[in-house]
């Protein structure tokens, strides 16, 4: 019987990333997946003869660090720095289109407002970018490296300048609805930006709890996967297999038996 250091149940993108990192540490890893293919919501399925799609249609803000660490480009992952357009549809045909730092389909004053908004938000996002992949140190009895992490964050916030620093602390407490109301008057533009800000948060536009931070996290990204999500899954799977990970599909887990505290 084969011995494994780690058994991972499920073969979604998070599981495949974990399996790759464990394999890089010379661990013997088994991944078991109940479905016929890997990927979870990112798996490609045929919903009609000749037509395939995944539930997850795009993987934005996939960390560049993971791409480099796992050398996913060598396994077929292609990236582009171009931001895909986000379109707010209007029944009258006057659609609003967002693409990076540009917006069309709105009056000139709204275009100017969006430029100011995007410039400020991108500045905040870039300021926070180095910290998204770091573990927040516990408060109290911190080691020197942990104290330095707090000091670095504090310094980067202070370097924003007094006015922008105050605006940052005020803004991160706002619901997205209030933030949009402060900057814009065009209802479709506000709806489009509000929707974009709340992706993945399970929050509503008027929800508090720092939903603006999720928007800043997404704005800190610099790439989108150019093809569909299954392309990312395929690259992760190929990378894992090349590192010796044993991936078994059609393998449903019925029980987890724990014996002798191991």
Residue ranges of model-derived segments:
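Helical element adjacent to the flavin cofactor pocket in flavoenzyme catalytic cores
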Residues: 213-260
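Rossmann-like flavin
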Residues: 92-207
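Acidic/polar loop patches that form or flank catalytic/metal-binding clefts of enzymes
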Residues: 73-75, 188-192, 242, 247-250
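Generic recognition of stable, solvent-exposed alpha-helical segments in well-folded globular domains
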Residues: 17, 116, 171, 175, ...
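N-terminal glycine-rich phosphate/pyrophosphate-binding loop and immediately adjacent elements
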Residues: 2-142
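Active-site-adjacent bridging/hinge elements
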Residues: 32-37, 208-214
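Generic, well-ordered alpha-helical scaffold segments in large soluble proteins
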Residues: 25, 179-183, 195, 235-239, ...
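Ligand-binding pocket scaffold of soluble enzyme catalytic domains
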Residues: 33, 85, 206, 246-247, ...
């Amino acid at each position: 019987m084969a011995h494994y250091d780690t058994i991972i149940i499920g073969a979604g993108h998070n599981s495949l990333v974990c399996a790759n990192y464990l394999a890089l540490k010379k661990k013997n890893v088994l991944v078991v997946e109940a479905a016929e293919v890997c990927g979870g919501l990112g798996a490609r399925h045929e919903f009609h003869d000749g037509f395939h799609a995944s539930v997850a249609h795009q993987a934005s803000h996939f960390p560049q660090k993971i791409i480099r660490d796992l050398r996913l480009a060598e396994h077929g992952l292609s990236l582009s720095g171009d931001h895909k357009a986000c379109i707010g549809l209007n029944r009258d045909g006057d659609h609003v289109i967002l693409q990076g730092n540009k917006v069309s389909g709105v009056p000139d004053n709204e275009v100017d407002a969006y430029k100011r908004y995007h410039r400020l938000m991108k500045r905040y996002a870039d300021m926070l970018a180095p910290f998204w992949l770091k573990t927040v140190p516990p408060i109290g009895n911190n080691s020197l490296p942990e104290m330095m992490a707090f000091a670095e964050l504090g310094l980067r916030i202070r370097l924003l300048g007094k006015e922008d620093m105050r605006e940052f602390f005020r803004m991160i407490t706002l619901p997205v609805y209030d933030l949009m109301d402060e900057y814009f008057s065009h209802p479709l533009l506000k709806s489009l930006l509000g929707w974009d800000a709340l992706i993945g948060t399970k929050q509503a536009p008027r929800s508090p709890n720092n939903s603006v931070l999720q928007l800043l996290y997404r704005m800190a990204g610099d790439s989108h996967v150019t093809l569909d999500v299954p392309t990312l899954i395929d690259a992760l799977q190929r990378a894992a297999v090349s590192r010796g990970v044993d991936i078994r599909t059609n393998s449903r887990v019925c029980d987890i038996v724990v014996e002798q505290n191991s």
